[in-house]
């Protein structure tokens, strides 16, 4: 029989990586990571009033919604199999003050939204944030005194707010304000109030990123912000510091961990999952979303493929799920497969 060995066989030791890529069925058979609807958390923005669906110019396809419309959106999400929503309020300017006192109102916008959604769609998870930026007149995540974000007073306030959010029906508290000691304080406050079953998804590594701009428009804080958030968010250059920060949250009782933003920090996703083994999530933030949308709208990229590829990259990096504004769009695509 004629020897049909090729030079390539000698070079590769008869190992050819393309054999497993030769057909659709083989590619599907050996695929290492898959994106499913179970991986999706949908962030939504809540505004006062009723009957409101207000498009956000900087986030094409994303709307601010009044509570009644948010309930309708929750029904749609549940029908598509999306496990959970993450809710963010855009409250009236006259309710915002230096200390974010409206965060401690039991009947504030976010708590009313939680109660309404849980009543109408009890089988969908509700994840709420206790950061003060939607409630402050200066746009910072904590209490501002003398030009400084005061850590301990802010921790006291967000722990109290967490209990109120749990009282309203929140399933998971996701504190994003990056104050030292907040996870332990929230855990103790929740347990003392009888909310042992309410989880904490820590924004364990939230970076001082350029990718948050459209979000700040969505909650109307961009024009309010005095200075920057570099004294409490993590420097984008610091990976080891990020893991140390996450380790403190794990020790204080975090049930889940989050990396924010997502795509620029896939290395942190991987390191955090490897280090702690806790359920790990990435937040595909507003700037990441808008980049894809804007490029697709201009015909520069295939928007659907880019969307799915970036979401799959989070799974490959070790994430158990993703907070993404694409959630409903992706869920509809996956349902057709």
Where are the model-predicted features located?
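Exposed beta-strand/loop interface patches that mediate assembly or binding
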Residues: 13-19
């Amino acid at each position: 029989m004629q020897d049909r060995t090729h030079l390539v066989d000698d070079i590769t030791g008869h190992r050819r990586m393309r054999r497993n890529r030769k057909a659709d069925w083989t590619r599907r058979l050996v695929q290492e990571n898959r994106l499913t609807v179970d991986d999706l958390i949908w962030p939504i923005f809540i505004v006062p009033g009723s009957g409101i669906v207000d498009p956000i110019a900087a986030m094409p396809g994303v709307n601010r919604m009044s509570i009644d419309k948010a309930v309708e959106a929750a029904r749609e999400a549940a029908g598509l199999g999306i496990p959970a929503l993450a809710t963010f309020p855009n409250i009236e300017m006259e309710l915002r003050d230096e200390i974010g006192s409206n965060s401690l109102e039991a009947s504030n916008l976010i708590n009313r939204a939680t109660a309404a959604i849980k009543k109408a769609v009890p089988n969908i998870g509700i994840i709420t944030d206790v950061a003060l930026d939607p409630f402050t007149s200066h746009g910072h995540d904590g209490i501002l005194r003398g030009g400084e974000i005061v850590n301990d007073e802010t921790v006291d306030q967000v722990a109290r707010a967490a209990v109120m959010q749990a009282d309203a029906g929140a399933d998971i508290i996701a504190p994003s304000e990056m104050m030292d000691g907040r996870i332990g304080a929230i855990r103790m406050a929740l347990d003392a109030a009888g909310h042992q079953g309410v989880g904490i998804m820590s924004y364990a590594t939230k970076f001082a990123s350029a990718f948050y701009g459209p979000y700040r428009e969505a909650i109307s804080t961009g024009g309010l912000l005095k200075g920057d958030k570099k004294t409490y968010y993590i420097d984008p250059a610091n990976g080891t510091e990020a893991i140390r920060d996450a380790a403190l949250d794990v020790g204080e009782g975090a049930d889940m961990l989050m990396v924010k933003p997502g795509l620029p920090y896939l290395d942190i996703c991987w390191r955090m999952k490897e280090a702690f083994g806790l359920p790990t999530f990435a937040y595909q933030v507003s700037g990441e979303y808008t980049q894809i949308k804007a490029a697709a709208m201009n015909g520069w990229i295939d928007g659907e493929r880019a969307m799915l590829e970036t979401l799959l990259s989070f799974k490959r990096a070790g994430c158990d799920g993703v907070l993404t504004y694409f959630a409903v769009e992706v869920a509809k695509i996956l349902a057709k497969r």
